[in-house]
């Protein structure tokens, strides 16, 4: 018995083959990892690597993006990365294309040389709606296709605005698409304590283009029944007349101010205050339409444009309503 070597019991051939075979083949070379995540179509689920039991957590490679699996069903992707919709952004302002230089035209008035119709839109001031505090007026000047031509802003201190309201002296600055001030309109203070037919109580507007160079005046004339103005040149020589309706504030209809020649025979243009329905009676957000001939001198167009603001302050710049006291 000392010459016999102990051996293991014989096993069936099938069991030995099963022990030799591995559940998965071990790759000869390490896999090629890529740090960039490239989503693709879903493929078959890979079995765990050799030597790891089923359900063992395999940490992700650095830089890999974990996948999100929604619960409760499959949800399609609504937005691509980087293309989320941005809300509450103001619409871009569409400006009128810059015209070519016009001979003998003040800088900045080249836009008016190409137009026969412009719209003056006053901004709604939320502070005036909630309180009785008067703020500086702002206007957008647009053409017929809703392109911005000018921006007009009032430059008056807080005390003057709230002390004198619609009778206040003011300075209006007109800027173009580049922010350059091309025109200035100013109204001096007129005492209203005197008789309304007294010359010292009549309103007047001076128009400067460019700022510092006077091109004309808009002067009020006494009239018992209707609004009456004269458009004058820089020497205060009357060039045109403006005649308003008998009732300047027409409820439910437009208010038309006609621009006529000095003899009153020919009609040159008009300034129309549009009726905006219920909004016109609640807030100071006026809409004016100015019409003049295309071939009219550009300085006279600027004077008609300036007379629109004097009319607005005198007849349509209403003080805010007073609160009822208990």
UniProtKB/Swiss-Prot annotation:
Task: Indicate the transmembrane segments per the record.
Answer: 300-316
Q: Which InterPro entries match?
A: Scramblase
Q: Where is this region: Disordered?
A: 1-32
**Entry membrane topology:** Single-pass type II membrane protein; Lipid-anchor
Q: Which Pfam families match?
A: Scramblase (PF03803)
| Lipid attachment site numbers (S-palmitoyl cysteine) | 193-195, 197-198
| Cofactor entry | Ca(2+); Mg(2+); Zn(2+)
Q: What is this protein called?
A: Phospholipid scramblase 4
Q: Native species of this protein?
A: Mus musculus (Mouse)
